[in-house]
């Protein structure tokens, strides 16, 4: 493992012993790229190191305003320009739609071709795209709908009413939190440890909620992530 640190940015490159040290200034064993590439103009030394690392796993830690988005998009453009990957081999994931749109716009300005073949988006957006493409294997209808937070709460309230659940003892909002927490931990109802009667009831309702969603062809945000993971 090689660790580089400078003001505002840290770069950790795993399995660095697989490559000669001189590759860290941008050379690639198969396709030697030019350090004079227009893509690298305006980058500082630390950003340039991060952009031109050889293929492998790298962790870049940087604070606010240090140019993380610029480094990431330039890294993608660099890999494409040097022929190390094809557009379909790129996946860039972020937390917000705004950041995803910014990355797409920057790459469109950098590259001479359409960037639609790349996988650029939020975690939920990319999971949605994956499940749409493989809905049969995922056990979903092609036209499955996504429940937002309010939709999910409404679905749980409907379930509680149907099965005469005591909503003072099991508030619907808390049930949605319980279900979301289980999914974040990768747990289906059968995987949830049952330690007391209340948890047992919550797990039963979780299973009923899953059955309801499956019948209606809908998924919540947690389901997008969990089903993609299972796929």
Where are these regions (language model features)?
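A basic/glycine-biased coupling hinge at the interface between accessory DNA-binding modules
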Residues: 5, 11-38, 55-59, 77-231
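Glycine-rich phosphate-binding loop at the start of an alpha helix
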Residues: 44, 73, 222
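Well-ordered alpha-helical segments embedded in enzymatic catalytic cores
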Residues: 46-49, 75, 227
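A sequence-level detector for short glycine-anchored, His/Arg-bearing signature motifs
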Residues: 47, 65, 96
């Amino acid at each position: 493992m090689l660790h580089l640190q400078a003001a505002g940015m840290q770069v950790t490159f795993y399995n660095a012993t697989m490559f000669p040290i001189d590759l860290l200034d941008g050379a690639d064993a198969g396709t030697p790229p030019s350090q004079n590439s227009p893509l690298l103009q305006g980058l500082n030394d630390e950003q340039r190191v991060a952009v031109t690392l050889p293929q492998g796993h790298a962790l870049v830690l940087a604070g606010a305003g240090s140019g993380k988005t610029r480094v990431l998009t330039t890294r993608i453009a660099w890999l494409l320009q040097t022929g190390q990957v094809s557009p379909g081999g790129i996946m860039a994931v972020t937390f917000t739609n705004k950041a995803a749109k910014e990355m797409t716009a920057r790459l469109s300005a950098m590259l001479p071709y359409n960037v639609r073949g790349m996988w650029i988006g939020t975690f939920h957006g990319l999971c949605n795209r994956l499940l749409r493409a493989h809905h049969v294997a995922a056990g979903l209808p092609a036209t499955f709908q996504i429940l937002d937070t309010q939709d999910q709460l409404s679905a749980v309230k409907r379930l509680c009413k149907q099965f005469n659940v005591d909503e003072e003892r099991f508030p619907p909002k808390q049930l949605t939190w319980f279900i979301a927490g289980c999914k974040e931990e990768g747990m289906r109802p059968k995987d949830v440890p049952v330690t007391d009667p209340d948890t047992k009831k919550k797990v039963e309702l979780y299973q009923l909620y899953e059955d309801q969603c499956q019948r209606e062809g809908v998924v919540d945000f947690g389901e997008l992530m969990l089903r993609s993971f299972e796929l």
